[in-house]
Amino acid sequence: RDWNPDVLIVRYWMSYFAPSLGYITRKMKKHCKVISILDNVIPHEPHFFDAPLTRYFLKGSTGSVTLCEAVSKDLLNLQKDARYTVIQHPLYSHFGPKKDRFETEEKIGLKHGMKNILFFGLIRTYKGLDILLEAFGMLPDDYQLIVAGEPYGSFDKYQEIIDRIPGKDRIHLNLKYIKDSEVSDWFSTADLAVLPYRSATQSGISSVSYHFEVPMIVTDVGGLKETIGDRGTGIVAPEGTPECISSEIQRYFSD
């Protein structure tokens, strides 16, 4: 109230924040409009308490902005009279320009002249890295896979797959948090970004891919299909299986 704002904008993506943010927004709603930007309404890895906590938070909002239709659907399931608008996830522009591919391959330690597949970002179960690893094992020898991101928990189950599939010597792992200043290096090496997600709303990774003009293969879950749409910027895999992902990767390079 000391700020005396006309509008308070709050970003929300997981129920962990609902008690604290909901308390603030309910107080502030008495004095100004409260707009919630909803990355997710229900987390990718849900818990029994998500719905009641999110309802508590939403009651403090005057209106909401969702980043895809999938989130809008989740919102209406919890709050049938919700006031909202859909604005797709914006592009990121703070990662700098695309760099020379040869130089970034040298910097990272990649073999030149290969078809580079990129899996980028936090490694969580719902993001389907295991599916991509199995798919990669079916690809010819002129492909290499780049995995750049921090594991959310143990990497053991992924390492077990890597150890048994063909082509493990063509998998480059960088299992750590990627600084903003380093993001350009990874996308500048990529021919194709693959998002083999088991569930999704929208994805910030797709926005980074757009910024660096890297085509994508995504699974048909959540709002990922909306991201690709009819723009000719990638392929929506009809099935989230290793066989389908492998086939779509090869189709991309053959078309």
What is the role of each PLM region?
Residues 47-48, 76-77, 90-108, 113-114, ...:
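Acidic anion/phosphate-binding donor-loop and adjacent secondary structure
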Residues 59-98:
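Donor nucleotide-sugar binding/catalytic pocket of nucleotide-sugar-dependent glycosyltransferases
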Residues 110-127, 133-137, 146:
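Conserved donor-binding/catalytic core segment of Leloir-type glycosyltransferases
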Residues 120, 144-159, 176:
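Glycosyltransferase donor-sugar binding loop
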Residues 158-184:
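Nucleotide-activated donor-binding/catalytic signature segment of Leloir-type glycosyltransferases, i.e.
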Residues 185-202, 211-214:
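Acidic donor-binding loop of glycosyltransferase active sites
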Residues 215-218, 228:
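Short hydrophobic beta-strand element within catalytic cores of glycosyltransferases
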Residues 230-242, 249-255:
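Conserved acidic donor-binding segment of nucleotide-sugar-dependent glycosyltransferases
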